[in-house]
Amino acid sequence: MEAFVSRFVDRVTIHVAAGDGGNGCASVHREKYKPLGGPDGGNGGRGGDVRLVVDPGVHTLLDFHHRPHARASNGKQGRGSMRNGAIGEDLVLPVPEGTVVLTPDGEVLADLVGVGTTFVAAQGGRGGLGNAALSSKARRAPGFALLGEPGDEHDLVLELKSVADAGLVGFPSAGKSSLISVLSAAKPKIADYPFTTLVPNLGVVTAGDTVFTVADVPGLIPGASEGRGLGLDFLRHIERCAVLVHVVDCATQEPGRDPLSDVDALEEELARYTPALKTEHGAGDLESRPRLVVLNKMDVPEARELAELVRPELAQRGWPVFEVSTASHEGLRELRFALAEAVEEYRAEQPEPEPARTIVRPVGVDDTGFTVEPDPDYEDAFIVRGDKPERWVRQTHFDNDEAVGFLADRLAKLGVEEALAKNGAKPGSQVTIGSVTFDWEPSTPAGVAGVLGGRGTDLRLDQDERVSAHERKAAKKARRTSLDEEGGYVGE
């Protein structure tokens, strides 16, 4: 039987793969009356990116739970007549606002806040160059093209942190869901047993001209910061809240519980969660967030008596205290406008929102370096590591001798051959670059030796055998004179 999956998912692991670049084309221009038309192979198209885009219509990560693998389309291969391959289509994945992108090790890559904010999760591979782009004065007729590069491939962790202005925190069955249902039009599940709320609920509240959102976080218990109860699963949803609201059950009959001890226990859990919040995500602490205390269930006579006893001590802490009843709606107007005022103060302190931006994974600035080290698994073998050598190897079609020679020229120009010689490599030594292992022969020429001179050059292009009009007339006149002399005719 298939396991039940909640419709609210706030943490998933996905695998993203960008499209591969298309291969370049090696072709020669063919047209009547144009012999040796030269190379005209087009470049391959770039592979498509995988992008995460904040979409206001998406509220959970449920789609990624069912489809954790995402792959963009590949670039198309180049063609003759200078036709470049089509660029692969980007794959756009909508995510809810407040999504945090992390590596499997917990490193934060992006915090997606703001509609339209885009994160390039995987970049498409570059297309290979065609032989037209590879031609030069020294290499006028390349008989090869470069292969397209593979696209990026990553495992990513997506975490959703609700973007709410006020967060309701409290023990299970304190009345948080009932409170959000009367403050807003939200319809959370409400029942008289603990942990009725298993997922955060968001509600939109209007107080005068101010509109703000309130999050109902599942109930906390002592030890939540260490994983007890629902643990850290939902504590992350209060990280972005401007105001924290302690909802206290003044009608509880549980032994050893009272409003003061409940508030102290909640504050202790929040204080324990703050160091983990700073360490893992670099976010600010929760200690400086303004607090409001809501003494709930004032429709019960015993609750009102208890509220009168604890209210002075709570007020001494500098927190506004409100006595409310979700059944009779007592005190809701005052609470609504107090929350609006606190939210407005927080918004006034914040900088102007930035326009939608695109976040790209940082790429190393210097990719020209490389290292040569002995292969620990084999004798007289070496491993070359570096972005450029490994990329060049991926671009090389090893069934083409001229392409292999071009790779050898590039490696020699970069200094790889010199570095191998300094490290003791000899002709025939085994060298590994990326996924390719070959026997090293320094400065080995490649390509067609008969017709071609240097690699990528065609001696026929330098030969000028066409006869000029003057030469044709002179030859015709010479033939006519020869025929006249043979026939004995003498002109005037």
UniProtKB/Swiss-Prot annotation:
GO terms for cellular component: cytoplasm. Its EC number is 3.6.5.-. The keyword Transmembrane helix does not apply. Residues 6-163 form the Obg domain. Mg(2+) binds at S177, T197. It is found in: Cytoplasm. Keywords: Cytoplasm, GTP-binding, Hydrolase, Magnesium, Metal-binding, Nucleotide-binding. InterPro entries: G_OBG (IPR031167), GTP-bd (IPR006073), GTP-bd_Obg/CgtA (IPR014100), GTP-bd_prot_GTP1/OBG_C_sf (IPR036346), GTP1-OBG_CS (IPR006074), GTP1_OBG_dom (IPR006169), GTP1_OBG_dom_sf (IPR036726), OBG_GTPase (IPR045086). Its cofactor is Mg(2+). GO terms for biological process: ribosome biogenesis. GO terms for molecular function: GTP binding; GTPase activity; magnesium ion binding. Residues 462-472 have a biased composition (Basic and acidic residues). Gene3D superfamilies: GTP-binding protein OBG, C-terminal domain, GTP1/OBG domain, P-loop containing nucleotide triphosphate hydrolases. Residues 164-344 form the OBG-type G domain. GTP binds at residues 170-177, 195-199, 216-219, 296-299, 325-327. Residues 362-442 form the OCT domain. CDD domains: Obg. Monomer. Belongs to the TRAFAC class OBG-HflX-like GTPase superfamily. OBG GTPase family. An essential GTPase which binds GTP, GDP and possibly (p)ppGpp with moderate affinity, with high nucleotide exchange rates and a fairly low GTP hydrolysis rate. Plays a role in control of the cell cycle, stress response, ribosome biogenesis and in those bacteria that undergo differentiation, in morphogenesis control. This is GTPase Obg.
